[in-house]
Amino acid sequence: MTIPEDLRYTKDHEWMKLLDDGTALVGITDFAQSELGDIVFVELKADGTTLKTHESFGTVEAVKTVADLFAPVAGEIVASNPELASAEVVNQDPYNAWLIKMKVANPAEVEALLDAAAYRQLIGE
């Protein structure tokens, strides 16, 4: 199971990468995509949507289930990944197939998320 060291993680199995411009990429972890199975569709809220921490920003639909996606921190969606038209990219490379890019309201919130070691412990690795 791949768990990159340079990302932050949530207990809901989302990852977040803070960028230099104050925005962040958000996606689902390798663990999440493997638990979901074959992802067939991703539905996300529109660009410009303001999110509270832990608020749903969309869903991922797999062959046997639908799972909510939760904002790791508060902020505003500024973009969604155009590659998600082919939802299987999330299974193939979950850490490059980001779901949304968001403007983070409080960068300190990102630091409060789990680091790679804590996430490994959470999933029993």
Swiss-Prot record:
Cofactor: (R)-lipoate
Regions annotated as coiled coil: none
Database matches in SUPFAM superfamilies: Single hybrid motif (SSF51230)
Residue numbers carrying N6-lipoyllysine: K64
Domain Lipoyl-binding residue range list: 23-103
Functional description taken from the UniProt entry: The glycine cleavage system catalyzes the degradation of glycine. The H protein shuttles the methylamine group of glycine from the P protein to the T protein.
Protein name: Glycine cleavage system H protein
Taxonomic lineage: Bacteria, Pseudomonadati, Chlorobiota, Chlorobiia, Chlorobiales
